[in-house]
Amino acid sequence: MHANVLWFCVPDAEIALAARSFAGKIRWKGKVALHSSGALTSDELAILRERGAVVASVHPMMTFVRGSRPSLAGVPFAVEGDTAAIRVARRMVKDLGGSAYSIRKKDKAAYHAWGTFASPLLTALLATTEQVAAAAGVSRKAARARMTPILLQTLANYAEVGAASGFSGPIIRGDVDTVNRHLRVLRGVPAAREVYVALARAALQYLPAKNKNALKRVLDSHPS
């Protein structure tokens, strides 16, 4: 194989297996081996390092779904590993239009959990909102169309002013009666009710809100 850089873009559980399968097939001295896992470190490629390669993990903070090819322009890539491999990875990221930054090995699991909150779990939250919409007599298709403007504005607010200044609704106002009303009606959608209580508690912990003690009592009176 004449390539100087090999980038293993395989499921996490298969990275070490793929590296092992290639270990004896290539003369690794002077080559660069990368993998694209967000949760695992460059040590998954240790067997190639032992054979003379320099290795790194290179992960884009971006969502990829079947049939979609998102632009990588401006996308941040977290990189860690051997110094020489990181230099190569940074050049590759730049060529892709992204921006690379360093991450410590010990921080990768938390980094990947962060990304999971930012996209897959956000999608799970949106699926939950569709169930609440159904309780209000709104179909899934209609709910998606009607939610899109508020979702886009919420993300725009977050991007422009951050979470605290972009927060709105009954919790920031300390509207105990409305929160109580929500919790009562959500008894008919128990999974959504659990999510509501968990997120409301997070809001009281991390975001500005009036009547925090009263809101906490309401949430405590409606255990999930």
Model-derived features with residue positions:
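Glycine-rich beta-alpha junction loops
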Residues: 37-41, 62, 83, 107, ...
